[in-house]
Amino acid sequence: LTATDGSTVEFYDEIKAQGGVKDVYFSVDKTYVVAFYRKAINANDKARINDIVNIHRNRIFTSDAVGQYWTAFFAWPTKIVEWKGLTGIVIPFYDKKFFFDGIDPSWPFIKNGQEKNGKWFSSAKLINKFVPVNQKGTFLSRLHMCLKIARAMRRLHAAGLAHSDLSYNNVLVDPLSGNACIIDCDGLVVPHKFPPEVVGTPGFIAPEVLATKALKVDDPKKNLPQI
């Protein structure tokens, strides 16, 4: 396929993973994935994606050392494609450190190749029960991991963006190296331009948003995720 920027995108015509609204295909060289929205998206969503892929990506990930520093913090969409009447986005393949490796085959809870999403490491109880000793990292490495999550969100907010669906599943972590990566960045909120599509995930919802959760989306009294 030819992306909107004129570059070539190659992938296998086989769905490898599915999310809530997208089907994911692997590229031929496995350096990126192509995620197609299962249903046709409206003009507002197309404009949002275009701004995220072009305007905001170029502002955050500049060519200097500072811009390149942030590339490890986000799985940011890099291109837009159209195929069979559907819109898709090209996303860099997650770094291998964000997949479990070295798990004993007899371990019942986690298997090699699973994503290291934040849920596994969100409490001492979960870590001690489900995570093998060789995957836990140290207190210091987990502290570095948490600092990088906070740093990534602060950078988003500094760019005038907000992640409306932050959750355990949308943060990949690696307590061994102390790294973290924010994913699902194609639905970011742009204040006064692109409103949030979801209220958020329980446990991650701001108090003022939770207080008006029962109200309809178009109710002027409803608080939605924003900066």
Range-by-range predicted roles:
Residues 33, 90, 182:
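Short hydrophobic-acidic sequence motifs that mark active-site Asp/Glu residues
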Residues 72-141, 194:
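Conserved structural core of kinase catalytic domains
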